[in-house]
Structure formats: C-alpha cells, structure tokens
C-alpha cells in the first residue's frame, strides 16, 4: 500500500480546511500569482497609472497583439498576474457587470462596487465543489469621485493601495515604492516610479517588454503610454540607475583605499 501523506485529503479538497486552518488550493492559486509576470500600480492626486511586464516568449509573436492591461470600462482598467486564462474570465465578468450597472443606473459603475463583485466570484470558487480557485490576481484601477487602486487576491480578499505590485517581482517593486513614494507625487513622477519599479524586476528591461496605461480625473478615460514616451522614460531611468551604480562603486573603492 502506497504511503499517503497526512495532509493529502486537505490538499485535494477545495472546501476542506486543514487542521491549521488553511485551504491548500487557495495557497496554490497564490503561488501561481507569485510566479506570474509583474504588474504595478501607482496612484497620485489626480490619477492612476498601471505598468505590466509582457513576457514575450518567442520572437515570432507580434508584441502589439500581446495586451496585458485590459479595459473594463472607459474609467476602469485591470492588470493581471498569474494564469492569464483565469484572468481573462475575470476581466470578461467585470466588463459584463460594468455594462449591467450602466444600463440599470445610467451611470458608470463605481470601482469599489465592481471590485466587490469580482471578489465575491473569487471567494465563491473557494467554497463550492466542482470548481477551483482562480489562479490570478488583478490590479483594478480607475477614477470616479477620486482615483482608486485595488489589489484582488485569489481568496476573494481585496485591498486599496497608494502603490502596489503583484507577481514574481512584488518584493523588489514594493521595496522601491516604500523608498520613493510620497503622497504629493505628480503624474510624471508617478509614471516614472511605476516604470522604475517594474524595470528593477526585469533582467533586461525594454520598451517592447513593458506596457503602461494611465487615467486622469480631468479626462476619465484610460490612455496607453505611446512607445516613444515609454522609451524616453525608460532611457532616463536606466541612465539614473547606471549613475547610481557608478557612485556606489566609487564609494566602495574609496573605503577600500582608506583601509590600506
């Protein structure tokens, strides 16, 4: 008879808690997010910016066809990490809910309402048999009365942030936000900070491998950052990073000289 680990039953069942209070399938869904492409969001007084990593695995793929920032409504967008097929289902559901709200009430859906509906769906997939948790997290951002930025977890939990990252580069990006984010940040600095945080998580950051979109309170419509502007921001950031590395090396050498 094959040896069966004690936790095997809890491991396979979606709706059964382990003795220490965990749902293993939810934890595994979170692991899918941790291995996914990095996505970041930064909020400023009058808007929000999203930036995502585009993992283009073949030179034959058309980069322009590989979208990672999805428009939900004119004023709301989402950036996923994890299993993109799962994220697509959530995005389609969010679009449907946004249309239903607009037809019912004659006005754009508040982001908080939409986030709660999506997280209700996610939570339901941790509670019933015959389904599995969504292996995707979403950054959902937009403007109504004010700019808003939310992270949705595979468990159905959600959090509002000033600046946040999901995916494999979360820890690196969050450390950069902790160091550089400030409450009075403006549009240009917010876009630059988002690109900086994302670039720091990539081995070889390029404009082709990054997608950026933003929205402002004035226009209340999402815009993708043009390729030329993205390259300009990225070149400035890479040059600043290079100069910082040179300064650090010089400091190290000066300390070395003092020791001899």
From Swiss-Prot:
One of its GO terms (biological process) is ubiquitin-dependent protein catabolic process. InterPro entries: Ntn_hydrolases_N, Proteasome_alpha, Proteasome_alpha-type, Proteasome_asu_arc, Proteasome_asu_N, Proteasome_sua/b. The formation of the proteasomal ATPase PAN-20S proteasome complex, via the docking of the C-termini of PAN into the intersubunit pockets in the alpha-rings, triggers opening of the gate for substrate entry. Interconversion between the open-gate and close-gate conformations leads to a dynamic regulation of the 20S proteasome proteolysis activity. GO terms for molecular function: threonine-type endopeptidase activity. GO terms for cellular component: cytoplasm; proteasome core complex, alpha-subunit complex. It is found in: Cytoplasm. This is Proteasome subunit alpha.
